[in-house]
A protein has these predicted regions:
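A conserved amphipathic terminal alpha-helix motif
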Residues: 111-114, 118-161
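Beta-strand/loop substructures that line and gate deep hydrophobic ligand-binding cavities in soluble
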Residues: 79-132
Length: 161
């Protein structure tokens, strides 16, 4: 299954990317209903690994994620190495839409463990949980950086995000 969320922020790509490099950012992006204990987080760098303890649908899990494809002020990705999903790949994109405007895009590709029917039945439930998680995260980003209103001029390249 795939998930994507986009938000236009009133800040430079560098500022938004740098903020994500901070260990405190991860804690701020964690919603109160999804408690997460950081076991090991060496920081964001190519091939760095982070280990967390969290709960999904009330079930406790250790989650180990590896960062890859880290491109300064452009993107970074993380993939689940150990955890509740068969596959989890999360891509964070930072696109400049002017000097002080950043389009932040989160893209997630995930597969649940078990047979295909598990994904069909539980996939929508998990998708809603992921949507709530990223709704919270993008609200945090809007509070941190402010919202850049889309231009309504149909000739503007910023009109479509």
């Amino acid at each position: 299954m795939q998930y994507s969320r986009k938000t236009l922020l009133a800040s430079s790509v560098q500022s938004v990317f740098d903020w994500h490099l901070s260990p405190e950012a991860l804690l701020k992006l964690t919603p109160p209903w999804q408690p997460m204990e950081v076991i090991d987080y060496p920081g964001l760098a190519e091939n760095s690994r982070a280990v967390f303890r969290t709960r999904i649908l009330g079930i406790p899990f250790y989650w180990e994620a590896e960062h890859f494809d880290v491109q300064l002020n452009k993107q970074f990705c993380d993939r689940q190495v150990k955890g509740p999903f068969r596959q989890w790949i999360h891509r964070h994109l930072f696109l400049a839409k002017g000097n002080e405007t950043c389009l932040m895009i989160d893209e997630v590709d995930f597969t649940l463990p078990g047979p295909r029917w598990i994904n069909q039945i539980l996939g929508n439930v998990i998708h809603r949980k992921i949507d709530a998680l990223f709704e919270f995260r993008h609200q945090v980003l809007l509070q941190q950086f402010g919202e850049r209103k889309k231009k309504t001029d149909s000739l503007s390249q910023d009109a479509e995000i």
